[in-house]
Amino acid sequence: MKEYQTITEISGPLVFAEVDEPIGYDEIVEIETPQGETKRGQVLESSEGLVAIQVFEGTSGIDRNASVRFLGETLKMPVTEDLLGRVLDGSGQPIDGGPEIVPDERRDIVGAAINPYSREYPEEFIQTGVSAIDGMNTLVRGQKLPIFSASGLPHNDLALQIARQATVPEDEESGEESEFAVVFGAMGITQEEANEFMEDFERTGALERSVVFTNLADDPAVERTVTPRLALTTAEYLAFDKDYHVLVILTDMTNYCEALREIGAAREEVPGRRGYPGYMYTDLAQLYERAGRIQGRDGSVTQIPILTMPGDDDTHPIPDLTGYITEGQIYIDRDLNSQGIRPPINPLPSLSRLMDDGIGEGLTREDHADVSDQMYAAYAEGEDLRDLVNIVGREALSERDNKYLDFAERFEAEFVNQGFDTDRSIEDTLDIGWDLLSTLPKSELNRIDEELIEDYYEDDAESVEAEA
């Protein structure tokens, strides 16, 4: 272990020290203050004879007389099944007042990419209890499905709802229910948001099956880049060593990318698009690609990263690059939010690329794909007609067009809108879908198999009259 007492400058969260030998990039550092307090940091920049260290806990109490110890290793996460139910800060230290964590082992937080040959294709359904996701943009075990939101929208409420409600439905054939866990990584959140998260986790009992990492807005930027890696290292251990199905929720990835930009500026790197580092695509891929399933292992890692699009712009580098790497997106819509729709998910620009592999008979229900396709088509038709109504008025529309307008309104009010406390099973979601589709004449249901229409279509006086 190398120890120095050569601090030359302290600037904000940065400490600069002179060294007489090469120091590794990202190496972990312990700084002991003259008062005996020990703080941890990470090497941000290492040049000949001088290193820049970003301190996790802030630089208060550190002066030129402090001792700097270079530990010769990068950050490692102590992993154990006992992490379930615990709350940690953004650098992996417990902050819940619980007992000391005794790890089974310590793992490098960078992790290793899953060998493509040993990957198993994601194809089992995860039920979030949210109709707009389960019914229209189904989440599949091992998938990475981001939520695209914007400033002022209730993405945190949706994140908590998913963390609370998400389950892997019981395998009826084996009669066994797989163990399910949630790893929740919050980056750059305010103290108020952190308190809301913890109150919700504790009130609903979701904390028992969760590991929570919280990096606050006033914590150092380098810690923000560490938090998702700690969360994913924990998830990989629970999934591939302990056979859990783990859902990783990361919020807010925009704060993570801002931290990358801040660190890049401190290193005087040549910036890329809009000042973000040129390697941001690779960096994000290193996080997102840690989702998946491995042959011969029972567990899985599924990711829901949440990001706020600056200026509601989906061409901004953060959502743009995220869209290239991930397998779809869920859009939080500002107009739906202003109408009081909760959660305000717009199904039309949303997409789950792996949905078709995780639904159908034996997974969800035989009619799932057809119902989803038909609702997409009917809602899109209703949306187009809304634009027409603004020009010609509703009385100028045909009876058929009015039915589609009514469908669009009921679809938003009854299917998408369910509140943040309602947990719907996939059966409930599909039944609501049939209830809405049954307001349209059977002749309009051209995306659904006739046998399914006979089994599920709800005939009423209006429909019979329309058919006649």
From Swiss-Prot:
GO terms for biological process: proton motive force-driven plasma membrane ATP synthesis. PANTHER family: V-TYPE PROTON ATPASE SUBUNIT B. GO terms for molecular function: ATP binding; proton-transporting ATP synthase activity, rotational mechanism. It is a peripheral membrane protein. This is A-type ATP synthase subunit B. One of its GO terms (cellular component) is proton-transporting two-sector ATPase complex, catalytic domain. NCBIfam families: ATP_syn_B_arch, PRK04196.1. The keyword Transport applies. Has multiple subunits with at least A(3), B(3), C, D, E, F, H, I and proteolipid K(x). Gene3D superfamilies: 3.40.50.12240. It is found in: Cell membrane. Keywords: ATP synthesis, Cell membrane, Hydrogen ion transport, Ion transport, Membrane, Transport. It comes from Haloferax volcanii (strain ATCC 29605 / DSM 3757 / JCM 8879 / NBRC 14742 / NCIMB 2012 / VKM B-1768 / DS2) (Halobacterium volcanii). Belongs to the ATPase alpha/beta chains family. Component of the A-type ATP synthase that produces ATP from ADP in the presence of a proton gradient across the membrane. The B chain is a regulatory subunit.
